[in-house]
Structures are given as structure tokens and as C-alpha cells.
Amino acid sequence: MERKEFKAESKRLLEMMVNSIYSQKEIFLRELISNASDAIDKIYYRALSDDSITFNKDDYFIKVTANKEDRTLTVSDTGIGMTKEELESNLGTIAKSGSLAFKTENESKDGHDIIGQFGVGFYSAFMVADKVTVTTKALGEESGYQWESTGADGYTILPIAKESVGTEIRLKLKENSEDESYDEFLEEYRLTSIIKKYSDFIRYPIKMDVTKRELKEGTEDEYEDVIEEQTINSMVPIWRKNKNELKDEDYTNFYHEKRYGFDQPLKHIHISVDGAVRYNAILFIPENIPFDYYTKEFEKGLELYSNGVLIMEKCPDLLPDYYSFVKGMVDSEDLSLNISREMLQHDRQLKLIAKNIKNKITSHLKTLLKDEREKFEQFYRSFGRQLKYGVYSDFGANKEDLQDLLLFYSSTEKKMVTLDEYVSRMKEDQPYIYYATGESYARIEKLPQTEMVADKGYEILYFTEDVDEFAIKMLASYKEKEFRSVSSGDLGFEDDEQKDTAADTDEQKELFEHMKTILDGKVKDVRASKRLKSHPVCLTAEGEVSIEMEKVLRAMPDNQNVQAEKVLEINVNHDVFDVLKASFESDKDKVDLYTKLLYNQALLIEGLPVEDPVAFSNDICKVMA
């Protein structure tokens, strides 16, 4: 018996492949099953051009057998088998792929696809086995051969008698160590789990002898273990079925089988693309926010399959962050994988798929908004924040795609509205899209700054989430209409009463300068208000940072004490202003007291903390005394 050396190359190369290429030892079973599937595919291809070969799919299968006594695990198939030369070529040369060569010769025949593209998957068996024995008989050959190896020291090939065509790979599992237990790969439940996880959609039956507990014949309460051969895999993936054949409950069952969520899917998206890149996908929008969605433990990503074989449980590159809530899977024949079939060799195809998926999700959400408004609003309550982050992130690169999906509460409609609906109702003389920010709709409605805009009959959008104003600042405008906060210095309109107010402000310049001095460092300016009607005072902001944005930024762990440029506005038509004027002429100490009170009052209205609550309390007591 002649021992032969591996053609490519040494113990170090094999050790690198076994120890470095694969991240999880369980992958070996996926690789051996994929190779077995390829072997059956090759008979199918041969039958296409050879009338003497009849391909009846029911005759072909893969069998996985565990023997605890011998500590062996066997994967056998009824595929095409290998000749002695093919054993030498495919198994005697590390990183030589018979499947890849076969695929190249038989490109795109009748939709069947060879899974294995590298000659490395077989060698993953050495991650769990001390010895690997391959017995095989090729189609059309009279005798079979046995290939055997214990690793990098080489291999032997012997002729053997074998009746049936096909290949059997028997692994002699390693002994357990302190760090690793190889017994798990002899356990029925573990093998079943691995097959379902990675190879559930292999197109041929994967069979196993399964132990069942049954009532012993002739008894009423005595049970016995019965061995029954079962097909473990589903074989036909739902995503390759015609959409017209599937019902909503089929998608819901798939959602639960894959454990994408414990809730019901709000929407499913079934995609089949055959263009620049070919892929199938089934995506789900969950009904509820996952419990860990806003934690660092949450991982975005879709399951990624290559020809029905799972290669990545969560591929993050398939989804943009703002669609991270989407669950589901993608299967493609066009992926360029690395030799371990666990990672992508380069990402051109993946980028094309990801771009297409992003566009499909956006399109389906727009359709949902148009045709099923109630369901869309349910979705928006859960994931609207993510869409706003999408508008704001990446310097607004995605704002054009997402702006028509945004909803905000309307002051006039008393419900959520789109930006398009708002603009369609704008009055002819209305210069801006107005918005107000606050912690709740009820608080916003009471803001002094909303009075003038509301009295003009203009609709106001209410922003109650911390990301709202950041997203709108990034949008800047919608359909050539700029966004304008009701707290901004210029509201875009001025009536006669406001012009008179401006004149009054000029007359009282000395008073406002004095108040500004008292509030030195706290406000940029004190001025007469053009927006207040019934309220005596309010705070507004100038510049890019609004008061609401200041609150958000200051709440962040790494805040840099960002502050809005605040302006204290005084209603010169209010009785309080008359008191201020009179005090300025007779008792400036009272002006100081009133100024501080008005400033703190304005802070409270905005939901900002009073800087010195004790001093504020004392000032109130002074007024009451």
C-alpha cells in the first residue's frame, strides 16, 4: 500500500486551512453535505447529454449516520462517485475543486447549480476527525476505491469492491479534550440542528436514523425506542416557489420557523430578481420593536444563502442602518465566496443586492403608506424614529428616498400627516412649513411661540422626538418650501400691530439693554416680541442650534456643553411690560428681580431647568411679600 504526499503542500498549509479558514467546527457537516449534493447534481448534468442515464430524483439522497460505539460519523450519497484519477486530483490536491471545474464546463444548464467551488470544504473534516476514509465508486466504473488520510502526512488509495455508485465519507472523531467535546457530533439532536441550520434547503433528501419513543405493541403503558429513517431537510425553499402559490400564512409560518420574531410580521416582501445580479429574498417588517432593538446587543442583518446553503446568519451589509429592523433572508447564485464559503471574497455583487433590497423596501413602504394607511402608521409608531435617523445620517445622502415616508402630528388635522399632505394644504400667502418642538403634543399646544402662527391659520407640525429637528434641519426644505421653527427670529410675516411693536421696542431700548446686562451670559439679546399675544415672555433661539437641539445634545454622554443663542422676547402689549416700564423709571432693583423671574419663567415654559431653584423660589417670595 503506497502512501502519497499531498501535491500542495505540506502540513503547515493543511493546519492553516483547518484551524484558520473556518470559524466554527460545525461547518464541516455543511461542507460534506454540499459536496454530496454536488455529486448528485453531476449525474443530473450527465443525464442531460447521455440518453443511457435516467435521472429519477426520487432515487437520489444523502445519508448521515452516527455510530457512538466506534465514534464515527458517516456522510454518504448516491451521487456520481469518483474514479481513481479524480480522487488523486480532487482529494490529493488541497484547494483543487472538482465542482468548480465541472461548473465551468457545464455553465448555466437548466437552472441546476453546483454548490462547491473550492477544494477546501472536504478538508474541514479534519477539524473534528483524526482519520477520514472515503469509499467511492464512479458511474460507469466496475470497481471502487478507498481514499484514507490522517492529515498532512499524506494519504493512501486502494481498489475495493463496492456495489453501488456513490461516495461514503467516514470520519473517526477526535478524542475529547479539556477545551473541546467532539461527542456532540454523534448526538442525534445536534446533527439534526446543524442540518436544519445550514442545509435545510439542499434540493435532495438528507436522511438520518431517528430514535422515536412508541407504545410497545401489545401493551398499554410500556414504551420502547424505535429507529426510523427520516428526511431532515425541507428541500424546497419557500423563496423559490411562485408567489401565486403562497398564502400569507405560508410567510407567517416561515417567519416563525426561522425565529425572526415572536410577534406577527406586519408586512412580507417576496423578491425574485434575474438581472445584473440574480437573487431571491423574503423580507419581513416586524409588528413590534424587538426587545433588544435599542441595545448594543442587537445585530442587524439578513440570513445569506448561496444556492440554498446558509453561509452567514446575519449579513449586516445587506441592510442600511435605517432599515435595520427588517428581518429575512437572501439567496444568490452569484456570490464570490472565499475558500471557506463563510465570507465574501469581494463585495461587488453584495453591494448590488443591497442597493436593490434597499430600493424594494422603500417602494413597499410607500405602497403601504398609500394603500394601507392604518397599517403604515402602526409601523411608523414602532420604526419611524429609524427613518428619521436615516434622513439625518450620512450627511443626508438618503433624504430624498425617505422624506415622503415621514409622518408628523398636525396642529389643524389632529393626526399624523405626511409632508406632501401638509404642503398640499398650505395657504397661498404662507411662506414656510412651520414646526414646533416639545415633549408632548399637549405641551406644544400651550407654547407661547405658536400663538401668532396659529392665529394666521397656518398649520404647525409638532415634533416630539429628539431626532425630529435634526432630520428636518438636514432636509432644509420640501417641494421648495423651507422649514421654519415657530421659535425662529423671522417667521416670514409681519402685520401692522407687529410694526407698532417694533417701534415700541426702539423706544424701550434702554430698558432691554438693562435687562440684557442683568442676564449677562445667559441670553444673546432681550427684545420686543413679534409673536406673543397673550403670554408675557418666551425664549427663542438664533443660529443653527435650537433650544430643543440644545436639550438633546446636552443629554448625550460626550456633550461639549453646546448652547443655543437664546433671545428673551417680551410682549410689550402685556400688563407685565407696563409694570417693567414703571419699575425701570422708579425702582431698578425691582427690574432686576422681575427680569430674573421672567427669564426663569421662560426656561420653565421651554422645559429647561432653572439654573438656581433656591434663588428662584426666594425671588417669588420677595414678590409675594
UniProtKB/Swiss-Prot annotation:
InterPro entries: HATPase_C_sf, Heat_shock_protein_90_CS, HSP90_C, Hsp90_fam, Hsp90_N, Ribosomal_Su5_D2-typ_SF
Chain residue ranges for the region called B: 342-551
Positions of region (A): 1-341
Disulfide cross-links: none
GO MF annotation list: ATP binding; ATP hydrolysis activity; ATP-dependent protein folding chaperone; unfolded protein binding
Keywords noted in UniProt: ATP-binding, Chaperone, Cytoplasm, Nucleotide-binding, Stress response
Segments of this protein annotated with the region C: 552-625
Recorded coiled-coil stretches: none
Domain of life (superkingdom): Bacteria
Location(s) in or outside the cell: Cytoplasm
Pfam family, one: HSP90
Keyword Chloroplast found: no
Statement: the UniProt record of this protein carries the keyword DNA repair: no
Entry's Gene Ontology cellular component terms: cytoplasm
Family: Belongs to the heat shock protein 90 family.
Subunit and partners: Homodimer.
Database matches in HAMAP family: HSP90
PANTHER family assigned: HEAT SHOCK PROTEIN 90 FAMILY MEMBER (PTHR11528)
Described function: Molecular chaperone. Has ATPase activity.
Protein name stated in the entry: Chaperone protein HtpG
Taxon lineage: Bacteria, Bacillati, Bacillota, Bacilli, Bacillales
